[in-house]
């Protein structure tokens, strides 16, 4: 069962996910990658280019090259690295721009810490895969930028966003669906993730300290100890706002926290975090449905449930429950992982063009209104799902 799953992951990665971006998204005219393909498979060559998409392409192809050693993946990763450094990196103030126009000129120059985290994730993975010193140098620079400008030495944690020059910004939101709060679970999760990866290749004392601190923030501030769900939005003093449960973030955080503790290699910390990992994954399973998929979120104030099945939530569900099987021998979790993979194959994979669709709606209809590739729709969640199950 486990071996069949791995064979299917290799096939998914190498035939449906990775070729799609190599064949359709490389912008030969203006450099880097196109900004968008619609859910109807229409390329938008003049769409804006997002830092997150570029950084996630960099991570995905670097990791695929590290795992499989194929030269075309290295070329794709190198293209993403070059474009990130030459166009997204702000050589005057540090950090990365949020977006560029299709020609590669800065558009939204704000410093969204989440995006800088992904740049570190991609660059550190490229260094891990190739030994490239330039990628590590820029990853370390960006780490220093986050620590210098975003870290709150007084109240702890990291602020959400700043202006290009690292000053206060009125609208800190990562996206339109987010609350305008200073500290968020999502940004902390996606600082934990690149810091973990950077620590694999750069054993710096401050980085180590901040990685320990981030794990502590999750267990002490972000985790709701009563429900074992993650709280999503906080004011500067860590007071939780807007009680919403995000099942996909719960299951994603469960394995990323576990990974961070393992990479630090501290047996005491691992022993401390393992019960937390299991509790968060158990809480996330409230979002699983009888057909194997995982729904999006629940508003605890109104009781409203968003029952759509987003592509990224399904990918993280496969990884998160497989993690419980891999490290704790949990057969029930393996079944959750397999069931969700079967759900993905039934409902989300595009057998005609490749890649996955954005979501299956709660009413059972396929969502083709949202992007097939774009600012938020990247090869990272589903690519990483395959890479995680094939690795170790």
Swiss-Prot record:
InterPro entries: 6-hairpin_glycosidase_sf, 6hp_glycosidase-like_sf, AGE/CE, Cellobiose_2_epim. It catalyses: D-cellobiose = beta-D-glucosyl-(1->4)-D-mannopyranose. Optimum temperature is 45 degrees Celsius. Its EC number is 5.1.3.11. It is an enzyme of class 5 (isomerase). It comes from the Bacteria. The keyword Isomerase applies. One of its GO terms (biological process) is carbohydrate metabolic process. Optimum pH is 7.5. Keywords: Isomerase. The keyword Isomerase applies. Belongs to the cellobiose 2-epimerase family. Catalyzes the reversible epimerization of cellobiose to 4-O-beta-D-glucopyranosyl-D-mannose (Glc-Man). Can also epimerize cellotriose to Glc-Glc-Man, cellotetraose to Glc-Glc-Glc-Man, lactose to epilactose, and mannobiose to 4-O-beta-D-mannopyranosyl-D-glucopyranose (Man-Glc). May function as a mannobiose 2-epimerase in vivo and be involved in a mannan catabolic pathway which feeds into glycolysis. This is Cellobiose 2-epimerase. It comes from Bacteroides fragilis (strain ATCC 25285 / DSM 2151 / CCUG 4856 / JCM 11019 / LMG 10263 / NCTC 9343 / Onslow / VPI 2553 / EN-2). The gene is bfce.
């Amino acid at each position: 069962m486990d071996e069949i799953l791995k064979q299917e992951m290799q096939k998914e990665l190498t035939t449906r996910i990775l070729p799609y971006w190599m064949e359709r998204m490389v912008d030969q005219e203006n450099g880097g990658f196109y900004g968008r393909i619609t859910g109807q498979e229409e390329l938008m060559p003049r769409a804006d280019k997002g830092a997150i998409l570029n950084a996630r392409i960099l991570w995905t192809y670097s990791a695929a090259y590290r795992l499989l050693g194929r030269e075309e993946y290295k070329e794709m990763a190198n293209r993403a690295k070059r474009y990130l450094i030459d166009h997204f990196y702000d050589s005057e103030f540090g950090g990365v721009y949020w977006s560029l126009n299709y020609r590669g000129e800065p558009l939204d120059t704000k410093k969204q810490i989440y995006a800088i985290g992904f740049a570190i994730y991609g660059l550190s993975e490229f260094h891990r895969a190739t030994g490239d010193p330039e990628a590590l140098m820029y990853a370390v620079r960006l780490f220093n930028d986050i620590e210098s400008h975003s870290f709150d030495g007084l109240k702890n944690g990291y602020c959400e966003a700043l202006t290009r020059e690292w000053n206060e910004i009125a609208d800190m939101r990562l996206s339109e669906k987010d609350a305008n709060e200073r500290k968020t679970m999502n940004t902390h999760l996606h600082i934990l993730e690149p810091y973990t990866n950077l620590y694999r290749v750069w054993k710096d004392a401050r980085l180590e300290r901040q990685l320990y601190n981030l794990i502590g923030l999750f267990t002490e501030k972000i985790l709701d100890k009563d429900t074992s769900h993650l709280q999503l939005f906080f004011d500067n003093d860590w007071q939780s706002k807007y009680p919403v449960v995000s099942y996909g973030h719960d299951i994603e955080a469960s394995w990323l926290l576990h990974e961070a503790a393992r990479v630090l290699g501290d047996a005491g910390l691992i022993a401390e975090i393992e019960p937390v990992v299991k509790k968060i994954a158990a809480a996330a399973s409230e979002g699983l449905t009888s057909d194997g998929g995982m729904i999006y979120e629940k508003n605890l104030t109104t009781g409203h449930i968003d029952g759509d099945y987003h592509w990224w939530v399904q990918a993280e569900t496969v990884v998160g429950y497989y993690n419980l099987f891999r490290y704790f021998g949990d057969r029930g979790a393996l079944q959750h992982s397999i069931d969700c993979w079967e759900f993905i194959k039934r409902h989300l994979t595009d057998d005609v063009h490749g890649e996955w669709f954005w979501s299956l709606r709660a009413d059972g209809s396929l969502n083709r209104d949202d992007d097939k590739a774009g600012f938020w729709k990247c090869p990272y969640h589903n690519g990483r799902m395959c890479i995680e199950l094939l690795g170790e």
